[in-house]
């Protein structure tokens, strides 16, 4: 059975968030097209993730080195590892997220920090880091109200680019993508822009 992890990195309702609307559209179509797959949903805004602080980082480093952890270090390391284990157990992963303030929501950044562990998602070699999860199939559903694919704001796009770089670090270099942009910058075209993205999400979900 194929294990599929759906990750939602936006706490707004679908009627107020294009990335959440894409998530729900993709999820509905995927379940219809792949009825035998095991689907798990992870809402990062409901998960109440503790930030990747010095104590968590210390605990993970000590654990990797075989050293003794304090009770708080162990508690936090266990939380990070539980999310990493869930990610590693998935054959396919769908990530839906917006561009907020040129980047990703803090909850999503924290989650990606949990995943970024040497020996698990990547390893160090004499020639630099090498990803360890290249076999994962990933779909990225991203929405940004402005225009960032080209023009004067292109260099400000640190949402999709950041996530793609993190995944490439893990060995996942060619994720599937649905990108909706410009619906706030061009309100007269918003309905058509969002509709086109929704159709793209449906078609990708069918074959993902």
UniProtKB/Swiss-Prot annotation:
Q: Where does FMN bind?
A: 17-19
UniProt cofactor note: Binds 1 FMN per subunit.
Q: Which UniProt keywords apply?
A: Flavoprotein, FMN, NAD, Oxidoreductase
Q: Which GO terms describe its molecular function?
A: electron transfer activity; FMN binding; oxidoreductase activity, acting on NAD(P)H as acceptor; oxidoreductase activity, acting on NAD(P)H, quinone or similar compound as acceptor
Q: Does the keyword Flavoprotein apply?
A: yes
Lineage, top-rank taxon, reads: Bacteria
Q: How does it assemble?
A: Homodimer.
The protein here is known as FMN-dependent NADH:quinone oxidoreductase 1
From what organism does this protein derive?
Answer: Listeria monocytogenes serovar 1/2a (strain ATCC BAA-679 / EGD-e)
Starting at the broadest rank, the lineage of the source organism is: Bacteria, Bacillati, Bacillota, Bacilli, Bacillales
